[in-house]
Amino acid sequence: MRALVVEMIERVKPLGRCEFVADFAVQMPVDLFLRFVELPAEDRPLVRGWIETIARNPDREAQIAAHAASYEYLSAVLAERRKRPGEDIFSRIVKAEGEGKICPVDSVSMGLNILFGGIETVTSALSFIVRFLAENPAHRRELAQNPALMRDAVEEFMRRFGILNLGRTAAADFDFHGVQIRKGDRMLLPIHLYGLDESKFDRPMDVDFHREHFRHINFGSGPHRCLGSNLARPELRVFLEEWIARIPEFSIAPGDAPKGHSGAAMAITYLPLIWAA
């Protein structure tokens, strides 16, 4: 993991600038994930394309097509793992099949959750973190001067910058604090607001690497906890350690500005950075 992160940073460092989302944030999680599950690097454009379509393309037909293509792709991967299992997570899933713990349909669904959960959220988290640090030099220098803070910094960034909103469909008419909800209405539930609750956090909108606790539910909790959380955390920490060590001073390119969108997933889509090469 660390070697790949360093390689990617060293690739952009001499340039003195980059569009962080396209040049880094959308690439690093995919490359790391493909290595983690022992899939060929050549599949990156396919995987990235499906994720981009499902997460950001408003065309419902395009989303359905991307879901179908990714389902077919992963079904083939799992079929191959049944013939030639290894030590990767997909091989462990098909092993659980053989032990009667899950069925083949559940295997594909679980694999897709890992695939999409382990990539898009990291892309968005990287972009929110880097934008904040580009605009807040005191926090940036605090991390540079005290690398031991990196682990807590990841948790604080995850608390402050939520990524996912849960979509739900109302099963019946009801009144919610004066708002009329009708059966069939679609709603977005911003679960990240838990981390911004003033009754639980002092100055919740501020980023503070020295909080007593950084409790958040951006990865869910209990049996529905995100399967990719144990990969996302070290990815973000290693990125912070290596980026700050190599490019400690950076900022938003003058005359330019970040762009983003909200919806089921919060994301920055454009982040122009500069630094002294």
Features from the language model and the residues they span:
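Cytochrome P450
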Residues: 1-277
